[in-house]
Amino acid sequence: MAFPKKKLRGLVAATITPMTENGEINFPVIGQYVDYLVKEQGVKNIFVNGTTGEGLSLSVSERRQVAEEWVNQGRNKLDQVVIHVGALNVKESQELAQHAAEIGADGIAVIAPFFFKSQNKDALISFLREVAAAAPTLPFYYYHMPSMTGVKIRAEELLDGIQDKIPTFQGLKFTDTDLLDFGQCVDQNHQRQFALLFGVDEQLLSALVMGATGAVGSTYNYLGKKTNQMLEAFEQKDLASALSYQFRIQRFINYVIKLGFGVSQTKAIMTLVSGIPMGPPRLPLQKATQEFTAKAEAKLKSLDFLSSPSVKEGKPLASA
């Protein structure tokens, strides 16, 4: 598969992995999920098996199956399907990277290993290069998330000269609040050869001002439409409207963070908003409480984020 003609830009939903109540992957709802993202949220790019997708809580076999289902269900509907293939060992990452190429994914991403950690830039690039080489036809993205990995190598340091060592390198998923580091990445990218995708949803407008080319996030599963309105306002240089959208989104995110917000709660919110059952998380995570879901629902309604009649009634959207 050749590199896509279009660079990855705009909103990218970090997809949830739907599960049954007994913890098995609920493959049959993924087609419905694709239709919901495209038709209801206006989101046509996805990031599969990342943090939101509990990728590192799945077996290699499960990760392969999940990737296949998203690619198959997204064909002729989604613009780009990027598969996260990061793992704690290079062999698993290489296997998943090769598989992503075989099934027709549009790109791969890799997070830094976080048990035995790379101690410097060269060591990390050596790991990333070996994984990228397993899928030489696919665009390669580095998934920068130091809060989860504990790897403190700055993204701007990593970007310096990276394409000389990883020819397929096409960009960065930057999930950190360090806007100085992100700004230096943008400054290096003056020819706009890389996709610089911001990963902190509640700070997206700040990143857009600095030059982000897109965003990857969990809230775009259910707040994609509102966030797209913010992007449109920003592109039209209507900063007042863009700020209004960002502040409304922040009110919700700030509220649920105070309640305790993570993958489990994201699954509960997505089930509530979309009507598609996301199920519980995989252990060691625990299911969101009914109290959390009720409070999140009330906040969504107060912000007019629950507007679809089918959503308010809790009815799943028909699968196309």
Curated annotation (Swiss-Prot):
Which parts of the sequence bind aceneuramate? 51-52, 175, 199, 201-202, 218
Which cellular component terms (GO) are annotated to the entry? cytoplasm
This protein's UniProt keywords: Carbohydrate metabolism, Cytoplasm, Lyase, Phosphoprotein, Schiff base
Q: Where in the cell is it found?
A: Cytoplasm
Reaction(s) catalyzed by this protein?
aceneuramate = aldehydo-N-acetyl-D-mannosamine + pyruvate
Quote the EC number: 4.1.3.3
Matches recorded under InterPro entries: Aldolase_TIM, DapA-like
Any Pfam family the entry gives:
DHDPS
| Molecular-function GO terms, alphabetical | identical protein binding; N-acetylneuraminate lyase activity
Tell me where on the tree of life, at the top rank, the source sits: Eukaryota
Query: Is the Ligase keyword given for this protein?
Result: no
Q: In which pathway does it act?
A: Amino-sugar metabolism; N-acetylneuraminate degradation
Question: What stretches pass through the bilayer?
Answer: none
- PTM annotation (Phosphoserine): residues: 308
BP GO annotations: N-acetylneuraminate catabolic process
What positions does UniProt annotate as the active site of this protein?
A: 143, 173
The protein's role, per its UniProt record: Catalyzes the cleavage of N-acetylneuraminic acid (sialic acid) to form pyruvate and N-acetylmannosamine via a Schiff base intermediate. It prevents sialic acids from being recycled and returning to the cell surface. Involved in the N-glycolylneuraminic acid (Neu5Gc) degradation pathway.
* Similarity comment: Belongs to the DapA family. NanA subfamily.
- PANTHER family in the record, alphabetically? DIHYDRODIPICOLINATE SYNTHASE, N-ACETYLNEURAMINATE LYASE
Q: How does it assemble?
A: Homotetramer.
Protein known as: N-acetylneuraminate lyase
Q: Which organism is it from?
A: Mus musculus
The encoding gene is Npl
